[in-house]
Amino acid sequence: MEKLGEDFFTKPTLMLAELLLGKIFVHNTGDGRCYRGKIVETEAYLAEGDEACHAYRGMTKRNRPMYGSPGTLYVYFSYGCHHLMNIVTEPAGVAGAVLIRAMEPIEGLEDMKRNRGLERTVDLLNGPGKLTRAMEITLSHNGASLSGDTVFIEKREDTAPHKICSSKRIGITKSTGLLWRRYVSDSFFVSGKKAGKAC
């Protein structure tokens, strides 16, 4: 299966937040199981001018992956209960990332349901902490390259047209006025609509 390469991810963060919509994220667990989901919601974070970004005040041990090669994962543990998965963007040395907020389940549904303790497909991946739990993404994936065989984005054309909306990001307290959330407007799998949207 062909994968998207580093050149795809070496783009401005806001552009990539939109280009990732409709793409298929894959996690091969190594024990014969595979999770696949279509990305339907993202948020952009940039060190420059964005106080909500982990790298706003510079590099730390925690945010170091954000300064690495584009097309790697930045996974962190939030509020002691959720892993959140970001895809690093921009050239190496420039901190930027796209948070994956929601996906539409494609493959591995029964394992996702077991991991989440849920039966409703629409609720499995409709939030950044939900999707990592369902797809078994943990801190062990922090810094992982999307050019490998464990986690990657499929190189495929998304033939289904979709309308993209923008809105304020969810669950932050700084730089709240930025319309840096992107989502597929007619998807049932997004984490929630938001005031101030622009479609």
From Swiss-Prot:
- What keywords is this UniProt entry annotated with? DNA damage, DNA repair, Hydrolase
User: Which GO-annotated molecular functions does the record name?
Assistant: alkylbase DNA N-glycosylase activity; DNA binding
Which Gene Ontology BP annotations are present? base-excision repair
What Pfam families does the record tag this protein with? Pur_DNA_glyco
Question: Known CDD domains for this protein?
Answer: AAG
- Tell me which NCBIfam families the record gives: 3mg, PRK00802.1-3
- The name on file for this protein is Putative 3-methyladenine DNA glycosylase
Q: Origin organism of this chain?
A: Chlorobium phaeobacteroides (strain BS1)
